[in-house]
Regions:
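Outer-membrane beta-barrel porins/channels
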Residues: 8-15, 24-29, 35-319
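Transmembrane beta-strand segments of Gram-negative outer membrane beta-barrel proteins
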Residues: 1-5
């Protein structure tokens, strides 16, 4: 379980409107694993891979982006099998069933005051994942790589665009949620001390959502990369802790108004405690969000000095 609390504020280029667009949200994940035979493990994951909650305050008639916003919700169910080829090498693969729904509003002077709104009904579709891992348990070495396929969706829509006389017009839209690649690494570097690192690339530029009435893309996102580097330390048989740095490189400073940040640098501090058959983990993350400009045919708002504070809690029970 995690709660994410972004502070995303900016100033519009018209009337110096002050925007506060970041809204807090939560994410919940459930995981179950079971060794069903010697060398074969089955896993089940229920999570929320994507989410967004953005709303621009201000009068749409007197501000660049007042009334623009987006709400995105998703759910995913993954069934994953892992097979140990030998003591060092394993392979894993699985299927993912994913649902996505959203509502997007485009308004303000930047959009010509068109007061556009689209509801994208829930769409469910399937994708897959595949990967492999190499490990040497004696030195706590493990390297794993996983590729996640894109997922193709087709959803019913309802659009409203008053300047064209369009009111609750039904339609459909086709889009994909992006493919991604994960690389994870860990190794022991001293007694009771672990070095961790990871890399993730998500191909968000593949996301094109073009509703019929609007006739243009709702969002224009850049591909994202994330690097992490951390150190974990076991203080006793029951207690361990970790510190992890995270980094996302900056891209084009002009970004979609529905995601007005550009890269980040963050730090996470976590602890893990064993109580009988249960393991309780918790942590906090602080991230400095990169400066960005909301782009609608040019810069419409400057976002600087923003951050995000997140808290997480995880409970593992063996039986």
């Amino acid at each position: 379980y995690a709660t994410i609390n972004p502070s995303v504020t900016g100033v519009g280029t018209i009337a110096a409107t002050e925007y506060d667009v970041g809204k807090s949200y939560t994410m919940t994940t459930f995981t179950y694993t079971n060794e069903i035979s010697d060398g074969l493990t089955l896993g089940l994951i229920v999570d929320q891979p994507y989410g967004a909650s953005v709303l621009y305050n201000g009068d749409p008639a007197a501000s660049s982006l007042g009334g623009t916003g987006a709400e995105l919700e998703s759910q995913a169910l993954s069934i994953i099998g892992k097979y140990d080829v030998n003591e060092a090498v394993s392979v894993h693969a699985g299927l993912r069933r994913q649902s996505v729904e959203a509502e997007v509003s485009l308004n303000g002077v930047a959009y010509g005051g068109m007061d556009y709104d689209v509801t994208i009904d829930k769409s469910s579709s399937s994708g897959w994942l595949i990967g492999a891992a190499y490990e040497i348990p004696d030195i706590a070495l493990r390297v794993s790589a996983t590729y996640f396929s894109e997922v193709e969706h087709s959803a019913d829509t309802t659009e409203t665009l008053p300047p064209l006389g369009a009111n609750n017009v039904p339609g459909t839209v086709d889009f994909v949620t992006p493919s991604a690649f994960n690389l994870d690494f860990q190794t022991g570097i001293a007694a009771d001390t672990l070095l961790t690192a990871s890399y993730r690339r998500s191909n968000y530029s593949d996301l094109d959502v073009v509703p019929t009435v609007l006739g243009s893309d709702l969002v224009n996102l850049n591909d994202a990369q994330r690097f992490t580097l951390g150190v974990g330390r076991r203080f006793s048989d029951d207690l361990s802790g970790s510190v992890t740095l995270s980094y996302e490189p900056e891209g084009d400073e002009l970004v979609s108004p529905l995601g007005p940040t550009n890269g980040l640098m963050g730090i996470s501090i976590g602890a893990r405690y064993t109580v009988g058959e249960a393991i309780i983990s918790g942590g906090v993350n602080y991230s400095k969000l990169g400066d960005a400009q909301a782009d609608v045919g040019g810069n419409r708002a400057d976002f600087t000095g923003n951050s995000s504070l997140s808290f997480g809690l995880k409970v593992e029970v063996g039986f």
